[in-house]
Regions:
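Structural beta-alpha unit
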Residues: 49, 75-109
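Conserved beta-strand positions in the Rossmann-like core of class I SAM-dependent methyltransferases
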Residues: 34, 85, 140
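Short, hinge-like loop/turn segments at secondary-structure boundaries
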Residues: 50-54, 103-104, 127-128
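A short acidic, glycine-rich active-site loop
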Residues: 54-67
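Short, flexible loop segments at boundaries between secondary-structure elements
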Residues: 137-144
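Glycine-rich, Arg-bearing micro-motifs that act as flexible, cationic patches
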Residues: 111-133
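Small/aliphatic-rich secondary-structure junction motif
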Residues: 1-53
Length: 144
């Protein structure tokens, strides 16, 4: 039923907890997981000035850090017999998640209910809320 899972992560507690649900779906026929981390470029110009580093250098650092944080999750999911693909993308989180879901032809998205920035969620609306409103496939939103 849910053979291909998209797991967008920002490494928040809720996102990490989602891994348990992904492993449960292995027993229900899941075969593939796409782990996605989206680097949100908003505000990076200010960060580059503050860090006295060029924009491209910051993006490279962020991608390397994301891949390092994903690696243990990738190994854990492979350890239960799932095929895992890792994608680190740049863009608006909601739009990029929807784009990757379409490109990868996933059957379900499993996402955390809140990201790392609760203030951002209160001001702008959470990514999970936007996904629920816009997605055309099943989505499981995992609470802490």
């Amino acid at each position: 039923m849910y053979e291909r899972i998209l797991y967008p992560t920002d490494f928040s507690d809720e996102a990490v907890k989602s891994v348990d649900y992904i492993k449960e779906l292995k027993g229900a026929g899941a075969t593939d997981v796409i782990i996605l981390h989206v680097i949100d470029r908003r505000g990076l110009n200010d960060l580059a000035r503050f860090a006295k580093k060029d924009f491209a250098g910051i993006l490279v650092d962020m991608e390397q850090k994301a891949r390092a944080e994903i690696r243990p999750v990738e190994e854990e999911l492979k350890g239960v017999g799932l095929k895992v693909k890792v994608r680190v993308e740049q863009g608006g989180p909601c739009d990029k998640i929807l784009q990757v879901a379409d490109e990868e032809k996933v059957s379900i998205i499993i996402a955390g209910s809140h990201g790392k920035s609760n203030i951002d969620s209160m001001l702008l609306g959470s990514v999970s809320y936007k996904l629920v409103k816009r997605v055309n496939i099943p989505i499981l939103v995992v609470k802490k």
